[in-house]
Amino acid sequence: PHDNWDFIAAGAMDELTTQKNRSALDALGLRPRFLRDITERSISTSVLGTPISLPVMICPTGGHGIAHPNAECETARGAGMSDTLMMCSTSSNNSLEEIAAAATGPLWFQLYHRGYDLTEMLVKRAEEAGYKAIALTVDVPSPSPKERDLKNHYSRELELGNFRGLDKDREEISGTDETPGWQVSRVAPLTWKELDWLRGLTSLPLVLKGLRTGEDAKMAVECG
């Protein structure tokens, strides 16, 4: 349906940042070089020790159930067929264990901080399920509604698979606009103090998703 497509394609608010990103990418060009021997060639690389066949990864988004009945499990299969990395969202419709069971390629787990207890639970489950890294989202302190969704009166509350069976209010486990029916999460703020705590929870590589300044990137490196 059209409203599902708008949910997938739309950027936050009036999509100004999306437009700027598109313009920046359109401004890039390739400088082809010729008369080279390309008999042996490879575009494979690795990211934090995870080998992939090409420098393209699947970034975390929730709510894949609006596009396929098998939701994120099917996305993971597609990533495996391309021999590349998939980052699975906290807001996935399938549980992280279900996605890991379906995957044939490497997985990272994207984490929203939902307070100490829920965050620790998710990190430990990701470790046990074989995920290769934790990617903590730091640039979504509260949901940013999409104007297209508001215009369409879009609301479709799909299951949050990672919290199935937990006795928690939706506002405790939501707080992202990646899944239809989002609500603002009422949890403690995320600061560098929480990052130190999180770093001590796991030996997996820890990535901060959404940093915008060199100063913050330097602080992240210092935190490990």
List the predicted regions and their residue ranges:
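Glycine- and other small-residue-rich loops at beta-strand/loop junctions that grip anionic moieties
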Residues: 10, 64, 68, 88-89, ...
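Long, hydrophobic, well-ordered secondary-structure blocks that form the structural core
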Residues: 102-111, 116
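Hydrophobic faces of well-ordered beta-strands that scaffold small-molecule active sites
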Residues: 56-59, 84-88, 107-111, 134, ...
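Short, acidic/turn-prone active-site loops that include or flank metal/cofactor-
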Residues: 92-93, 111-115, 140
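Electropositive phosphate-/nucleotide-binding environments in soluble metabolic enzymes
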Residues: 2, 11, 15-19, 69, ...
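Alpha/beta enzyme core
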Residues: 63, 76-77, 81, 98-102, ...
